[in-house]
Structure formats: C-alpha cells, structure tokens
Amino acid sequence: MPKISYLDHIAKLLPDQEVEAFQSCYLQKLPKTIKVVTSKIPTKDFIKIVGDMGWELEQTIQSDVFYVRKFTDSATLGQHFLHQGWFFYIQELSASMSAPLLDAQRWEIILDMCAAPGGKTIQLADTGAFVISNEPLNPRRKALIYNINRTWMINTAVTNIDGSRFGQEYPEFFDKILVDAPCSGEWMSYKTGGPISRNEWLIKSLARIQIKLLESAIDACKVWWKIVYSTCTLNEIENEEVISTITEKYKGVVELEFNKKYRPHRDHCGGFFVAVFRKTDRDVINHVSTNKITQKIPLKIPDFNISDKLQSQVKLYLTEQFDVSKIPSNSLFYSTINSIYLTTTDYLTLHSKLSLDKVWIPLFDVGRDGKRIPVHSLWNILGNLASKNVLELSDQQSQAYAEKKDLKITPNIQTTIDNFLLLKRKNYGFSLSKKVGDFLKNKLS
C-alpha cells in the first residue's frame, strides 16, 4: 500500500479552520517541559530554587511538569547540575499524560508493559508504588536499566517478557497496568525533520500488536482495577479502532472510562492518545480464572544474603558513616560476594512469582578485605538523609562538577570513609566524590 502525506490525512479529520494551525504546530519544535522528581524534592522547593536562579516556569496540566519559558544558565537543560543530580528530568508534556491516569498508590504493584526508555516508569515509581518495568528488546532494556539506576528508583524491577504473554503467565496478578504501546509515531517526525508520510500497511500491523498487548493486559489485571493505553500517534486505526475492538470483544469485562486525543494546536503538546479502562469482571473468553501463576525460578544471585543480620549491619554502617538514621521502613538490603544493594520489601513476595531480570540499585562494592566502597548511586538514594561525610556545594561548584570537572577544595575537610564525600546542593543529595589531596575527583556518570 503506498505511503500518503500524513498532513493530508489529518486535514481530512479536522475542521477547516484548524488545519492551518495544526500544520504550523507540526513543523515547529515543541516547548521544553521538565518533570520534577518529587520523591527527591518537593515541587515548591524546586520552584523556589530555580526561581532564585532566574528561571521562569509555567504550570502545565500536570502538577509536577512545567514549561521552561526562561532559562538563564549558560549550560543546556540536559547539562545543568539540577538535571545531572536528578532534581528533574526532561520529558515532553504529552509523554507525561498517561502514567498519572493510573493514580498509582504506594502499596500497589504496577506493570509498565512497554517501558523503555523509562520516563513513565520513573513517573510511576515516583509515587511510591512498586513498578515492574518490562522491555523484551535487549538494547532498549539496557537503556531502561541505565535510566532507572540514574534516578535511584529502588521500588522497581525489570523484566524481559513478550508483553502479549503477561496475561497467560500472570493472570490477575497486577493492580494496574500501563500499555504505552509501540506505534507508528507519526507525530514524531518533527524531532528528526524526517518525511511526513504514513504507511497504512505498517499502521494496521501495529494495531494488531496493540490489540494483543491490551488483551494480555486485561487478563493480567485484577478485577476492578485500571488499565491505561496510550500511543504517540493520532490516527484512528491505532487509537479509536483499537479501543472499539477491545470494548466490543470484552463487553462486560472492561469498561472504557476515559479517552482523549491531544492535538498540538489545541493542547500545546505533542500529538498523543490515551484511554483508561476499568476491568469489571473476569475474562470468560480466555478463562483467566482457571489459570494459576506457576512458581518462577528466582533470579540467580551468587551468595545472595537478605538476612536480618545483614539488615542490621548495613543500617548501623550507614548511621555511623553518614548519620543516616531515617531509612525508609520498606527498605531491603541484600548482598552478594562483591556488592551490597537496596530494593524494597516488595521483593520478598515478587521474586518467586516473576521472572525478574534486574531488581536492585547498588550501594557499595565490597573489597577483598571486606571493606565497603561507596558507589555513585548511594548519593541519590540516601544523600538527602545523610548529615555526616557530606559537603554542601555552591551553584558554581555544582555546575562545574556536572560538567565532569574536578573541584579544588579547602584541604582541611575531613572524612571517615576512605576520603569519600556525599555532595549536596540546598541540602539535597547531588553526587558522590572522593577527596584526593586538595581536589574532589569527579565520579558523576
């Protein structure tokens, strides 16, 4: 089937008075938007910090996502120390729309079925819910793990399962599910200046995949809980027609609670579609109620240790070395022969039921002599809680450090842990460094 102009296709769907406005928006860069990492810093504190720097933010329809209307620093947003320190991350407004519709809560187990590169997983984990972040493709999964590690989200685990198999392997297991489905991404051509065309055959092929993913999500979701479906495209085949197929096939099993198509000229964001389903009954089509979750082989970790003794030892060490006394109650430390990691107690109930690919954030390497050596993610996980072996930086020092520079410091700064220091800005954890003579060696990655 031949490719046709995407803009010509959209023109058939819009009122005449909106066509020109849409075409104009499509050919322009979107305004920069950022999401505040609220599990690290309250939004009001972040606004105060950047306001003092001369930034001008404008509230979007999301409470923790802002347009950046004025940015006064010489560094780019991505190079800024507040980004390197994960006070915020850069996320298009449209990409932030779907995750909040799940209304994630701390005690819930949520599946992000098509998770890479990880922005929506981070949004969901930022609420305190435990997120199973799935990506079957290895290169994309590596990027997903990298982003989760950078943002220190300990309440996450990564799986590498074909999304269409979740319903069969884990029937009625998850409280809520996000299906941010692979799509034609017709709206995304503005990013690369690529050809603005559409391929009907490709779109229909993707729609069949999207339907399979949604069917799997329906089977894997508990009764009376939510499923959110989203795409970054605007055509009907991947959006309204997919939704229609699901609601007709699963009548009495799911109800469509909400759906919206975000258009750039109306909503000041990228093109996006989102739909919210409520599962109201078991799926009699696939007989989910007769399935049972089989015991999974736990992730094999050499010399794995989660003993009560280890929990006490690590907590005592963190208290003695960093004066960290308010460790979250759901924290779970575990060790191997070479490292010590942190996750949450959700792991205790999940590891035998799910085939997990990754479920930890590293805190320390363990030397041959048994000595604990802090690793970079320690600062972001516990930096806000530490008051010993810490050093407060200025904005200028923080930016220099974000640019991978070593910092010259006062020689009389003392540490009690092999010259390691947790760096802070405005009393929030920023980075980890090692003092060598009069310099802080840069360990930002």
Positions of the model-derived regions?
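Conserved class I S-adenosyl-L-methionine
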Residues: 106-116
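Short beta-strand element of Class I
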Residues: 110, 129-134
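Conserved SAM-binding loop of SAM-dependent methyltransferases across substrates and taxa
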Residues: 117-128
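S-adenosyl-L-methionine
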Residues: 134-171
